């Protein structure tokens, strides 16, 4: 139950809590323990930002160093692993806790997007061999960072066209060579999850120590998202043992789909947190100007812009939370929702921050302004982890491919509670009823499992190859 959430996250306190409290009212998965965790995390992050400033004026190298320090501090205080599964060494809180933590991180600074959780290290937790898990999970839970290397010069939306390839060695291992582009955490990552073509020509993923022989880096200065080093990762005969393969050879595309179905809603939540901060900052700015007598009252167009941003940010956040729920449930629609939630969430966040910046006046466009930095970072997120037009295209393709499988006269299934109530009074009826002889659903019904089964292959085809590794 989360009925007492207001005592944990007061809407009067401002900050991310004022946004999270009403959202949490519709999330029965989050209890008082979780809301208390989020409140303490927000307070810890505020304190760490004072101790280790990462504002827009801080030099990139120093910001990177401080961001890693913040991650290690959060690991030591128990925040990093709050929503990591217990089987992976974490506290096992609901996955939506991580989504909310990402929102809080974005509210403070998008560069804090890797402050908690396993990030791309989740691939290691979920698919690595026992030996590799034992090698890396303790380090990741202790604050080490995992990077991902998918994108190449031809772009990140064509994973099937990967040219990085492995050749067999005499000792049974593989030698991987190629160049990965737009790689974030270039210098900070302790380990990389690298995608390449195996000797049979199939997309495969493996775990590569950041200190492995044959790795070379070429940094590139990004226009935003500059908290971590960014650039090219060159692999020249990097040795990969059988135990280093994620899942099994040839499953690379499946790993991409599953991982980013989980990861993209987190990106959306981070972006929306930054937009929420911009909304609060501009509202406070207008209030200050009114109290000082510089304006008699905010103009209608300013109030409309604030109100529209508030509505859109909350709506997009609800979509991101739904996408995360589907991912946690291993729902077949998780990849589709992940694409839509990330693209829409970042679009909303970027548009809101851009429009709100106009209300802040000249200070909002200073290079060292946090609002200006948020706009630069949000612009970067339009491309990172799936460029928005490719994600929208994947969603549209899925909808057109599966349209013929959806009957327009199909009944909408009742909510589970309503189903239970109905079955108590009318046994054998309702959208989940089954024929007493065949045990099958009535012929005039479409059940969710049946729809999922019929659309699974279409969704997999339509969403293939849609990713990017810039964050």
Predicted regions and their residues:
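Glycine-rich beta->alpha junctions and the first turn(s) of the following alpha-helix
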Residues: 220-314, 426, 430, 452
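C-terminal helix-coil-helix/basic helical segment that borders enzyme active sites and/or dimer interfaces
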Residues: 53-61, 287-294, 313-344, 357-365
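A short core secondary-structure module
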Residues: 173, 179-216
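A short, Trp-centered hydrophobic/proline-enriched beta-strand micro-motif
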Residues: 82, 142-152
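N-terminal glycine-rich flavin-associated loop
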Residues: 112-131, 159, 170
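Short, intrinsically disordered C-terminal tails of secreted or membrane-associated proteins
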Residues: 465-469
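Alpha-helix capping/hinge segments and adjacent helical runs
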Residues: 332, 336-425
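Amphipathic, small/basic residue-rich leader segments at the start of a protein or domain
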Residues: 1-115, 410-431, 435, 439, ...
């Amino acid at each position: 139950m989360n009925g007492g959430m207001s005592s944990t996250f007061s809407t009067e306190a401002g900050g991310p809590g004022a946004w999270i409290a009403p959202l949490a009212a519709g999330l029965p998965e989050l209890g008082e323990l979780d809301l208390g965790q989020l409140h303490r995390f927000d307070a810890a992050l505020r304190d760490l930002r004072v101790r280790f400033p990462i504002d827009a004026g801080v030099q990139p190298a120093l910001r990177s160093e401080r961001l890693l320090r913040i991650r290690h501090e959060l690991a030591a205080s128990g925040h990093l692993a709050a929503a990591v599964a217990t089987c992976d060494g974490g506290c096992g809180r609901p996955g939506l806790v991580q989504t909310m933590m990402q929102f809080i991180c974005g509210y403070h600074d998008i560069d804090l997007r890797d402050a908690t959780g396993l990030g791309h290290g989740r691939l290691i937790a979920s698919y690595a061999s026992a030996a590799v898990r034992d090698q890396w999970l303790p380090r990741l839970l202790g604050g080490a960072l995992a990077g991902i290397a998918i994108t190449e010069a031809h772009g990140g939306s064509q994973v099937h066209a990967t040219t990085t390839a492995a050749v067999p060695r005499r000792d049974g291992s593989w030698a991987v060579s190629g160049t990965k582009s737009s790689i974030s955490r270039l210098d900070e990552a302790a380990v990389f999850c690298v995608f390449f073509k195996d000797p049979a020509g199939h997309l495969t993923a493996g775990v590569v120590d950041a200190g492995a022989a044959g790795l070379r880096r070429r940094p590139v200065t990004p226009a935003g998202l500059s908290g971590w080093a960014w650039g090219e990762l060159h692999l020249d005969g990097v040795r990969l043992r059988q135990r280093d393969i994620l899942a099994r050879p040839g499953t690379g595309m499946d790993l991409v789909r599953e991982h980013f179905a989980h990861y993209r809603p987190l990106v959306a939540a981070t972006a929306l947190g930054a937009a929420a901060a911009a909304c609060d900052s501009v509202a406070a700015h207008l209030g200050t100007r009114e109290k000082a007598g510089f304006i008699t009252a905010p103009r209608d167009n300013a109030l409309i812009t604030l109100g529209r941003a508030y509505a859109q940010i909350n709506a997009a956040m609800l979509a991101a939370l739904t996408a995360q729920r589907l991912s946690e449930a291993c729902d077949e629609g998780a990849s589709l929702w992940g694409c839509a939630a990330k693209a829409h969430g970042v679009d909303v966040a970027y548009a809101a921050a851009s429009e709100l910046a106009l209300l802040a006046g000249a200070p909002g466009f200073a290079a060292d302004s946090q609002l200006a930095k948020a706009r630069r970072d949000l612009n970067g997120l339009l491309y990172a982890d799936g460029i928005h037009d490719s994600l929208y295209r994947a969603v549209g393709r899925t909808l057109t491919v599966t349209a013929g499988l959806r009957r327009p006269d199909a009944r909408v299934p009742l909510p589970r509670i309503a189903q239970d109530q109905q079955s108590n009074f009318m046994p054998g009826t309702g959208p989940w009823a089954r024929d007493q002889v065949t045990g099958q659903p009535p012929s005039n019904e479409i059940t969710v499992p049946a729809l999922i089964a019929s659309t699974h292959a279409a969704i997999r085809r339509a969403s293939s190859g849609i990713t990017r590794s810039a964050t």
